[in-house]
């Protein structure tokens, strides 16, 4: 078996985010890392939308990111610390839309190791040096400079190592143009290591150490070190030089402290706490991330606590000495991994879990209503300030980037009966959790819908003048009339446009600079800007049946297949070409390309005929109306559309930006198939045809504009958009009802929209999320979803949600009541009334937990519930709240042989579980019956068990339960489940159970898979085979009777198969005792599984499923990851394909090595050598290589670049999208 890995949706969780002017213009961009992916985002200052410019797989783990700019430069570079053992500096090239590696310096081994630098990066604010540090011992400093040609240079590394030292954070100190300085939070563990009593470990203090790079001596010295009172978790650089006082802010538990060397005394301020918080009062509070905003006159910091509250931190200075720290509550947003304040007044927030946000900073929080806290205010030691959280006041949400991270569980099924299966994804953490339904398709925003007086058959938009940015008219054609609507604040009918209203229209367009042309069955109407009208009438009884128009040309087909060609002369007159062309058959459809910039005409006309052919005809004056090429089609054509796509940005001599792309002829057939063919711009030859089936109706094609480039809207029984995005072609269905006709639409509110008709309505639509694979509907949940099952009869989902360190609703209400009573009791006689009012206000206050976070209850506190939900409407049908400290870990739906036709839901629950060191107060299996037509859970009984039931699976009319490390069979009883059989030989903890026939496959938490046979006659469960590697399994999936796919905690997927000679029926030994006892526990079972597939995904996989994703497609193995990625592994069907992709992968490894310097082969073999899997992500980077590199690689494979691209596209569309 050989598999090919395709990513359908890249990871959506963000681990790092930095901002800067990476493209060298004034506009600020954001670079984010999503684990093994680098992405460049550009927030649009006008619309507030975040656009993705570039996404690149780096085939390595991005551990740290920093932006820097050389002194006096205008462009920011990106420094990346990764697991490659190399420091890499990247530059973004807007013309190629690529990151280019400028420097790559090797300093250590690959992998995420303790003493290999890469975990921490710090840059001198003036861009003169960069420090890269490991978590322990090693720190290296590189000097950055320019050479004579103004190119960036990098020095050899200077060491700043210190043995036996742990590093917590590193920043560059802003010292102006003095010698560059770096500040580190360190801890020396040498004494603690050598002291057996443990006293030294208890007394170890963290130190703040300053390292100075002496540029004159080319040497790093430890300038100064100071022990800290509190344990710090991160540092913030304070602007220095002419901008501020320099120094650092140390964020530690409950305090923020300003330090600088010299005479500066330490200034420290407690971190304010929420008033009347339900959290454990003993729990400290820390800042988790921060952002700095600096202008010429002032600077401030936004720092966020672990509850999500943001404080604005400012420093008061007196003669360059800092005198106080001031803090003011700013707003509360979900906890972030990184925040970026942009110069345009936006705040970009990459959330730890869930969606990412872009906020507009509406106010700087300078009003006096909000109390300001200061380090100068007198407080007792250990006391702090209190504030009242409130909804957003200073920030305004302007855009949201959907993120599935973390995906806890996923199932693929067609529960909505839509032909194409949907992905039901349980994702998120705590109160921000959601159940999302993903459908393949582009999300459509409906801008406007209006009724029309009848059923129109076509719609167009035209501009008044070629220079106009927006459209002026919408023309709607009916069977016997034409309606003209003007576009303004509202859409209104106009009568003086010059269009003939008493006839249907075949086509209309802007002609030349400012004239309009209307083609109708009896002639052509040329409307000049001063409303003069020229008309050309059809000769005799003939009528126009088809036409094609662009800015300068009109071609019409008369009855009988006669073509007449018109072209505009320099004076703006429309002239008929002297000859006419008789076609051999009736014309069904025609298309002209847009006139290329700087040219007189479009050279080619495409004509589709009844005889199942499409012909390319020249419009060049030298051979006008001469046939150039022809293509036979499998069915009759319905429509044609010539577009220029896949362009690269180029600047001409005048500095005008334009795109140079390829001409494609799109052919829509009557049998619902779309063909895309390359049209040679010189000879007019047709080559490299790609085919896709779109739907059951004939395909109509319309040219629209998307992101400044031409795209094609194809309409069949479903509408599809074909567009080029990040150097790849996408053909994506629209998640919208069937449309009949469309045209591009540009107005002030909607610059790249679509106007379309559906029955008797006119709709204006916008497609904003280009590049998105899925559109999603989200339903909120209360706690972190763990697992869910589908009720087969009603298609409802039974979902278990469990949170650690959380209170149940009942406990929260009880705690609130208790705190309110304490408030009243603590007040004196005269303040009783006021205290009672405050207590009542506190009880009524309801801050949504999805924004403000849930209270942290402390370790060993659990909250859990079972939810019955309708996945289509998203309404909760039934909800069972479990008691405080009961945690649901497994769920199954089954029928019992002795339980009739009823469906039962079994939920495995642990009581008083402590995670570390692991201990359990006991477990239960709750049994519910599904009643009320499938929308109610009726509690039957609970069965006590001695450990956590982490896995439950139905088995031959009974259930298999993994209780701790015991595998048991239970049957349904009146008062509880009855134990029937048990196996004690699983080493650690049963985490999953799969059954097929008499076989049971059990996954252990750290010892991979065990194959178990149930012997009915002896009532025994016997382990007869296991795996040779100790895998830490997270999820597994049956592929066939002998084959299992599984994924582990470290991001690997493997497929293991029992060898053909494996016997699970121990024939020679009728009692089965030999298999039970004839084995040492250390060597496991007597038979071993073979490894067929090993592959490192790079993200922890939490769900695997064998399924088909498209109607009529082949089966693939679909996986989802903790970071929000979705991918598939697809089998090769022929040796020839496998051989081709194996060679392509080999060439890509050498020709296009990964960005961060990690070796691709060793990345995919991180824990186990990669076996029998080809990396489609690497192969698909072929499309984004330089054309000459593409040519050399494809020549090595004895093919042309279009053939290689076609192979890549074909294998993708055969299984997915």
Swiss-Prot record:
Task: Kindly list the GO CC terms recorded for this protein.
Answer: nucleus; U2 snRNP; U2-type precatalytic spliceosome; U2-type spliceosomal complex
Keyword tags: mRNA processing, mRNA splicing, Nucleus, Spliceosome
* Keyword Nucleus in annotation: yes
Primary place of residence? nucleus
User: Which GO MF term does the entry hold, naming one?
Assistant: U2 snRNA binding
Q: What Gene3D superfamilies does this protein map onto?
A: 1.10.150.910, YVTN repeat-like/Quinoprotein amine dehydrogenase (2.130.10.10)
Annotated family: Belongs to the RSE1 family.
Q: Per the record, what about its domains? A: The core of the protein consists of three beta-propeller domains.
Provide the assembly information: Component of the 17S U2 SnRNP complex, a ribonucleoprotein complex that contains small nuclear RNA (snRNA) U2 and a number of specific proteins. Part of the SF3B subcomplex of the 17S U2 SnRNP complex. SF3B associates with the splicing subcomplex SF3A and a 12S RNA unit to form the U2 small nuclear ribonucleoproteins complex (U2 snRNP). Component of the minor (U12-type spliceosome) spliceosome.
Query: What does the UniProt function comment say about this protein?
Result: Component of the 17S U2 SnRNP complex of the spliceosome, a large ribonucleoprotein complex that removes introns from transcribed pre-mRNAs. The 17S U2 SnRNP complex (1) directly participates in early spliceosome assembly and (2) mediates recognition of the intron branch site during pre-mRNA splicing by promoting the selection of the pre-mRNA branch-site adenosine, the nucleophile for the first step of splicing.
Q: What name appears for this protein in its UniProt entry? A: Splicing factor 3B subunit 3
Gene name, please? sf3b3
